[in-house]
């Protein structure tokens, strides 16, 4: 291990095994001593580097009872792992630590055996590329590639450490993930498990436990949606596009807090009253329903009633006026289909950026605009769409949430960024999440974290596939309909995505104008109510929707950095909606 080599370089004292070998008499004249490599390794690992040492001559003529009672030091894997420090996590997330150094430090803290070994490149990558993978306690992790060995090793170390950090001590994460948003679950099984070591068995057990939890979450979502539409069977087939947010409390309790369905977006002429719902894709609808849930939780906290305040998911944080999620809370996003856009790209195409299909791969990974159910590269459009309102693809929005959080600009005035811990796909036709991982994780480098404002980071959610809550269907009867629900709602609201307003037969209707409870005007109304209840006197009254969003300075800064990053990396420009749609007031 690297720690052994480092110790040897900084100390001139010979190891116990070296002294033993030098001082033992010839085997023919004295009893033989059985030496093991384990003894040398463990002595080096446990001996402190104090700069001085007392060397005692060893004869090797030990009495038989001494040899029979000689204790072999334990292997590294049997030593008690130390907790990973908050300082280490912060430095690694911000890019202050070299990935190789960070991996070896992590291995030392967790008492793991580690090796970086050279392997073969993945995919049809042409050219002089080197490939390495990390082997940790006998488990082989994903392959890292580079134009030189140093780069390949660094990429391999980073891939391994990113997975290893997913199964940190839950107690550590519960107390510290408010600033790091580290996932408390164990990592997925590495691609190529080696051997049948005890560590492999433990990893499989932990992963099986997480799979069981995700399957349980899927069944809870199915039950919740079925109950919501039980009185309205005509909307049951809308569940084929279902998306939902679930909050995990204490690792043992799960609550469905937001649901959305839909596959279309509004593409008609511009309206500036804030009462039209522009994007009705399931994931986006579920997220806007989640915002309504957050507003309810803020009102609980600001109610002044101790019983209601205790029920809120938010709590105050020292040294900041921004609220944070309470400890032991995790957020899961379930989707019955892969989101439209780059996530549906062939993963083999993405893994071969230097092949003949490189242009096609870049085109697939670029930002996309959703137009009438189809996704078109954003590079085909100008920086702002004036006449018709189109939306960015669901995959691009999900990627953005992994940097900015799911809370949006208005809520960022009250709370810290809220990140998704796990993404669960229930699509029976989806065999792996590789395409989604490439689109969401690999398009943005961790190094961006160091440039982001405080509390913002590049989040890395865990992804898995579970049983689908509802089978997909090609029924066109309700193709443009979108359902939404948030915890606390008495019934679902049904929106016609083509016109961006509630249908006449919807179980819930907010008024005669048929504006959805998810529209911008409704969100601004809730924002004004929270401003009043929180007694934020510094926030002026009568702000327009656009003016209120501009008050979230750090959020807007992070948003600008991310948009610039997309453009610099060749993914295209984020298409902005005309400012006029946010100039309404309440």
From Swiss-Prot:
Keywords: Developmental protein, Differentiation, Nucleus, RNA-binding, Spermatogenesis. InterPro entries: A_deamin, ADAD1_DSRM, dsRBD_dom. Residues 258-584 form the A to I editase domain. Gene3D superfamilies: 3.30.160.20. Belongs to the ADAD family. Residues 183-203 are annotated as: Disordered. The keyword RNA-binding applies. This is Adenosine deaminase domain-containing protein 1. The keyword Mitochondrion does not apply. It is found in: Nucleus. Residues 98-166 form the DRBM domain. GO terms for cellular component: cytoplasm; nucleolus. It comes from Xenopus laevis.
């Amino acid at each position: 291990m690297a720690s052994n080599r480092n110790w040897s370089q900084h100390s001139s004292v010979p190891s116990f095994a070296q002294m033993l070998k030098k001082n033992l008499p010839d085997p023919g004249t004295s009893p033989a001593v059985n030496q093991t490599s384990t003894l040398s390794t463990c002595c080096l690992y446990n001996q402190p580097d104090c700069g001085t040492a007392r060397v005692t001559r060893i004869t090797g003529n030990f009495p038989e009872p001494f040899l029979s009672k000689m204790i072999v030091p334990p292997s590294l894997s049997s030593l008690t792992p130390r907790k990973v420090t908050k300082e280490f996590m912060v430095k690694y997330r911000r890019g202050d630590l070299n990935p190789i150094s960070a991996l070896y430090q992590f291995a030392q803290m967790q008492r793991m055996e580690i090796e970086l070994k050279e392997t073969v490149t993945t995919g049809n990558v042409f050219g002089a590329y080197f490939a390495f993978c990390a082997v940790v306690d006998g488990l082989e992790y994903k392959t890292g590639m580079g134009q030189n060995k140093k780069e390949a090793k660094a990429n391999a170390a980073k891939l391994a450490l990113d997975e290893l950090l997913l199964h940190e001590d839950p107690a550590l994460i519960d107390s510290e993930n408010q600033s790091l948003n580290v996932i408390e679950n164990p990592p997925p099984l590495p691609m190529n498990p080696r051997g049948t070591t005890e560590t492999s068995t433990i990893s499989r057990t932990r992963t099986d436990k997480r799979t069981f939890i995700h399957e349980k979450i899927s069944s809870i979502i199915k039950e919740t949606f079925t109950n919501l539409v039980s009185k309205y069977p005509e909307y049951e087939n809308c569940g084929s596009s279902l998306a939902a947010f679930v909050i995990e409390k204490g690792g043992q309790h799960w609550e469905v807090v937001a649901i959305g369905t839909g596959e279309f977006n509004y593409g008609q002429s511009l309206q500036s009253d804030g009462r039209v719902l522009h994007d009705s894709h399931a994931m986006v609808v579920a997220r806007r329903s989640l915002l309504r849930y957050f507003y309810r939780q803020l009102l609980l906290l600001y109610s002044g009633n101790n019983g209601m305040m205790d029920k809120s998911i938010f709590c105050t944080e020292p040294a900041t006026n921004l609220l944070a999620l309470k400890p032991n809370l995790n957020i899961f996003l379930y989707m019955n289909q892969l989101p439209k856009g780059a996530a549906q790209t062939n993963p083999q195409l993405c893994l071969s950026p230097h092949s003949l299909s490189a242009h096609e791969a870049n085109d697939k990974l670029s930002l996309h605009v959703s137009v009438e159910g189809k996704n078109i590269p954003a590079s085909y459009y100008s920086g702002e769409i004036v006449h018709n309102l189109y939306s960015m693809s669901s995959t691009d929005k999900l990627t953005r949430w992994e940097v900015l959080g799911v809370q949006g600009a208005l809520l960022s005035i009250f709370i810290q960024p809220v990140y998704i811990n796990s993404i669960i796909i229930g699509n029976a036709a989806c065999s792996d999440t590789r395409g989604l991982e490439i689109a969401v994780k690999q398009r943005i480098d961790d190094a961006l974290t160091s440039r982001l404002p405080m509390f913002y980071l590049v989040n890395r959610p865990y992804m898995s596939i579970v049983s689908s809550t509802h089978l997909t269907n090609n029924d066109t009867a309700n193709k443009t309909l979108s359902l939404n629900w948030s915890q606390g709602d008495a019934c679902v609201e049904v929106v016609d995505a083509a016109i961006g307003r509630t249908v006449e037969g919807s179980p819930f209707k907010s008024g005669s104008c048929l504006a959805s409870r998810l529209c911008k005007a409704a969100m601004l109304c809730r924002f004004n109510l929270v401003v009043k209840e929180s007694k934020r006197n510094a926030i002026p009254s009568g702000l327009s929707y656009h003016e209120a969003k501009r008050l979230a300075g750090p959020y807007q800064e992070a948003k600008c950095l991310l948009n610039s990053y997309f453009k610099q990396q060749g993914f295209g420009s984020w298409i902005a909606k005309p400012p006029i749609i946010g100039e309404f007031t309440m």
